Amino acid sequence: MLGHKVVGRVVGEDRRVGVPWLGWTDGECRYCRNGRENLCDNARFTGYDLDGGYAEYTVVDERFCLALPEGYSGLEAAPLLCAGLIGYRSLRLTGDAARLGLYGFGASAHIIAQVARHEGRRVFAFTRPGDEEGQAFARELGAVWAGGSDQSPPEELDAAIIFAPVGELVPLALGALAKGGSVVCAGIHMTDIPAFPYELLWEERVLRSVANLTRRDGEEFLALAPQVPVRAVVEAFPLERANEALEAMRGGRIQGSAVLEVATS
């Protein structure tokens, strides 16, 4: 059953919980023992190895459910559980970078831009070339500059996060970095990265990926979100229109996050 971020109420209890992408770990492998359960050798994932949220009911492991902050509806909370969490983990991997580039201004980036601004960082947003609506959206959320991914930012970046699954963005992001900067690839998939000259990586620039999340990431981010406060922009679809929602996402026609809403009797 698809659906990798879920908000619902526990049957028989008046308790609302969030179910993130990481749905189970063995707790015994070397990664789990060292606080890196996101890299668990035997991890299982919501909507992939485990039943997801495209349903009225789903069975989940209570240990991996997250308490949701007050003040968020189910529609508002759902994007925080994947787009928000993977963005949060990516942001933490940039350290204290003051000038932050976000490549692909969609579900994750529009959430993390708010966190970055809250922390006093300067955000530079990169959208599909010619996407003036997306660039205006980024500026509304506090980006000091917004342009196409084919453009150079007006100043060097200390770090960049690539949310778009486009390998061609890697050398572009590296080329925009100051010395010692880092590029974080936040996606679970990316097209092939083209060859690039070593000089783009030289001077202690770093290129790394992000894999999944930990429960600690979830607890930290969901505690921080209402302090910012993070407000996810969502477009809701009823469950029976799931295929329409997926097509809209593939076509880049969603601003923010698409969320499926299950009718309750």
Where are these regions (language model features)?
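Residue-level marker of beta-strand positions
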Residues: 5, 15-16, 31, 57, ...
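Glycine-rich cofactor phosphate-binding loops and adjacent beta1-alpha1 units
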Residues: 124, 132-206
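Short strand-turn motif at the edge of the Rossmann-like AdoMet-binding core
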Residues: 186-190, 210-213, 237
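Glycine-rich beta-strand-centered segment in the early N-terminal region that forms part
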Residues: 1-30, 64, 69-72
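Cysteine-cluster motifs in flexible loop/terminal segments that predominantly coordinate metals
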Residues: 20-66
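Structural detector of well-ordered beta-strand residues that form the stable sheet scaffold
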Residues: 7, 18, 66, 101, ...
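Mid-domain Rossmann-like dinucleotide-binding core that forms the NAD(H)/NADP(H) cofactor-binding site
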Residues: 16, 70-153
